[in-house]
A protein has these predicted regions:
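Conserved small/polar residues in nucleotide/adenosyl-binding loops
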Residues: 196-198
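N-terminal glutamine amidotransferase
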Residues: 1-193
């Protein structure tokens, strides 16, 4: 099971976070293990927005192992140091939850491959999205729970896709939740309903 929803506002912006939450909540009977949003927000396009995690939500139903929260701070310090070493500057930093962060980064690059590989080589760290307008937010629980946890009802943008998941092929964790960032491309996200064999 699982469910996918998407919306596009042509030539205008709207409250895509709230709208997609309503659509995904209507699909909760298709799966409530995790829910993910790929939101394309209104930005000035100057800085990269990087959503990443330094740990897993180990709430009810999670297949992840509990970690000491202090390890999240250590991982964040290494991420910050790596970003600085690559000549980038963290312009804005938000820590939504102990394991979930959002950075705006001033970084002159067209190739995100080396950047993302260096960040993701840090044990326990995963980039959920990177781009000038894309933000992938995903976590355990149904659409309303995730929307409330991350205040997505305030996000204004032009389009969005989302996924309500019932885990059948992998664990109940953030890493396995959809949508996925189209690594290493800026502002690309994908969601699907089945296994993809390459």
């Amino acid at each position: 099971m699982c469910g996918i929803a998407g919306l596009i506002h042509r030539g205008k912006s709207s409250n895509v976070g709230s709208e997609l939450q309503g659509m995904l909540q209507a699909l909760k009977h298709r799966g409530e293990d995790s829910t993910g949003y790929a939101l394309y927000g209104d930005t000035d396009g100057k800085n990269f927005i990087m959503r990443f995690k330094v740990g897993e939500n180990v709430g009810e139903g999670s297949s992840s192992v509990m970690e000491d929260v202090s390890v999240y701070d250590e991982r964040k310090k290494i991420v910050d140091q790596t970003i600085t070493e690559m000549g980038a500057k963290i312009v804005k930093e938000e820590r939504t939850l102990p394991y979930s962060l959002r950075y705006e980064i001033d970084f002159e690059t067209k190739d995100l491959l080396d950047f993302s590989q260096r960040i993701e080589s840090i044990p326990g760290v995963e980039i959920l999205s990177m781009g000038k307008s894309l933000e992938v937010i995903k976590d355990l629980g149904n659409a309303k729970m995730v929307c409330d946890r991350y205040s997505l009802d305030k996000l204004v943008g032009t389009h969005a896709i989302g996924h309500a998941r019932m885990a059948t092929e992998s664990g109940v964790d953030i890493k396995s939740a959809h949508p996925f960032w189209g690594y290493p491309f800026s502002d690309v996200s994908v969601v699907h309903l089945s296994l993809i064999h390459i």
